[in-house]
Amino acid sequence: MNLLVLALLVSCFLASYLARGLKVLPVYFVLLPELLAGVALLIVLSRLVVGKRPQLDGRYLLFIGLLVLTMAMGIVAQRVPAGAVVSGLRDYIPMLSFLLLGAAYPFTSRQIKAQLVVIGVLLLVQVPTAVYQRFFSFAHKMHTGDVVTGTTTNSGTLSVVMVSGVTVLTVLYLRRRIALMPLLVLTGFMLVPTMLNETKATFVMLPIAMLAPIFFMRRSEKPFRRLIPLVAVFAVAGVAFVGVYNAMIQHRNPDSSLQEFWFEGGVLNYVYKGSLEGDERVGRVDSVQIALREISQSPLRAVFGLGIGNVSPAQLPGFDGEYSHYYRAYKISFTQITMLLWNLGYMGIVVYGLLFYAIFRDAVLLARGAGKDAMLGQIWAPIVMIAAMCMFYKAVLTDQEFIYPFMFYAGVVGRRAHLLRQERRALKRSQAPAAERGWGPASVLARQ
């Protein structure tokens, strides 16, 4: 089973890059992650047949049920073409397969450690790849960092996964698994791609990655003793990022800087163009406003959206949605919030809000526990925070490099949190009969 997960991780990061980027594999290899998702679904179903159901809290099952219901209602209400339905399901069914796989199979700590090592290697590969793309492969496009994608789908996704890797390094330091100097060197190395592709959101993600893990440890472990060195590393990384970003941006706008973007009104102009007031440009906030305006034309649209796949173009004829011409015109792929509103309506926001709440709740439960899963929970809680923040930044839930591993480990965390709750309930039940038989402190005093 672990080989399937390792194959998934490798294929998510490399299949599309090798097939479409380098063109050293047949183009059909881009479907490998989805094929593995199908295998995962068959494994989950086979375990259900023999009575081994996924160990998950009811909130996850509610999420799956509401998601399926919302998709079905949107398809029926908007009469989505069959081809568009098939195209749309590709964004949802595979991720559910990996959520259930993580919850259904009892992966050992050793297996998860092997998986994290593979992820670490894949993240390290992104650094030389990003350097090559920026200074060699796309040297003629020095005016933009968008071409620096590593082996991932786009530059934004690359930055999200690299900053998530910094979260792992931070937790390893707080847990005394690595020393300060390796943390400093590896953090700087991991952030190189985010500097080269000029991801401004790193300025928001990095504090979460490096500072939030402190608040998900038990007080008895005295995490704040390592706060000052950690803040020092964060400051060095931040200064380095600003310096490199300002040097890179000179190729596009010599008068621009990161400080100007964040503190002198640049961020507002970046996310909001005023398209509803007549500007032809569409920013991230504009894309959400347009989605809200369009789906509010009828109650069914508002609740369930225009239906999955109905606003997305396709490479094959017959798979385009009825409103696929909206995709580029209204920048539907700008943010995940925008995509959810178009595809699933307000229910999409509610459904995924429930998912993020359930994952975060379970991660915190593990992190503040005393068991061997505490480190896993401590890693996962900040990553969930980063993912939630990125809902307003990128359409991260449709990028395989992020969403497939994210949902798999959500299942792993959910399973372990569910078992921890069962263990605690069993302990309470075992203590209750002793108190009823008169062994509790109150009954002893009463007999005296």
Segments (PLM) and residue ranges:
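Loop-to-helix entry and N-terminal half of a specific, functionally important transmembrane alpha helix
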Residues: 4-13, 331-335, 342, 353, ...
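Transmembrane alpha-helices of multi-pass inner-membrane enzymes
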Residues: 168-169, 355, 362, 379-441
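Interfacial loop-to-transmembrane-helix boundary motif in multi-pass membrane proteins
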Residues: 4-5, 55-67, 101-128
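Long extracytoplasmic/lumenal interhelical loops at the membrane interface
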Residues: 140, 278-344, 363-368
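A membrane-periplasm/extracellular boundary helix in multi-pass inner-membrane enzymes
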Residues: 196, 217-274, 296-297, 446-447
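Alpha-helical transmembrane segments of multi-pass inner-membrane proteins
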Residues: 113-140, 152-219
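Aromatic-anchored transmembrane helix interface
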Residues: 30-40, 58-71, 81-104
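N-terminal signal-anchor transmembrane segment
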Residues: 1-49, 69-77, 129, 440
